[in-house]
Amino acid sequence: MILHAQAKHGKPGLPWLVFLHGFSGDCHEWQEVGEAFADYSRLYVDLPGHGGSAAISVDGFDDVTDLLRKTLVSYNILDFWLVGYSLGGRGAMMAACQGLAGLCGVIVEGGHPGLQNAEQRAERQRSDRQWAQRFRTEPLTAVFADWYQQPVFASLNDDQRRELVALRSNNNGATLAAMLEATSLAVQPDLRANLSARTFAFYYLCGERDSKFRALAAELAADCHVIPRAGHNAHRENPAGVIASLAQILRF
């Protein structure tokens, strides 16, 4: 089994750019940014429970890494960068720390490196279980209306929230709930030590209005790019800013 993805081919000799979306996104999420790099071959992946991979379920990040590895092999991708946002960023960090042959580096936007104590994990598990129950049982428009009121999305205005609620409500609530629980921060290990000892290039992107993840970025041994005029979802709020940072990283 492999993950559904959309592949766009560029010039030979350059590494692939493999894009991983955030929770409730899909393979289209990164395309505005990715298509600015047409010289590179691009793979836009649907994570389990999302988009064309909605029917695929996992028990945790080990399964996600295994599926990603098999997907890369199926496309004969031997040399690549992982670019991930939020959930996709966490998946990228996990996979990179577990080891992926051919990995050039990891570019993470707003991805959490992991909680650091049992109390934080227990609190997050309670929260994610409550959200998962709502995703399973309530209309998605109502759930996402509340989801985007969370503090991490404070930089969004009302129009941006309405647009995101409409977009994300096309998902399957049951498969979102399953993925939320399987990849909760409550079950993700703290990756700080692994990232400090890494053997791959590691870059971190965060919006200038995303105070939580700017603080987290400061804890990581990563080259951090702050995206102006953006909050947590920087590639959506300021795609040109993210394109500029990726171009600098890739020396495009």
From Swiss-Prot:
Keywords: Lyase, Menaquinone biosynthesis. GO terms for biological process: menaquinone biosynthetic process. The keyword Lyase applies. Monomer. Coiled coil: none annotated. This is 2-succinyl-6-hydroxy-2,4-cyclohexadiene-1-carboxylate synthase. Pfam families: Abhydrolase_6.
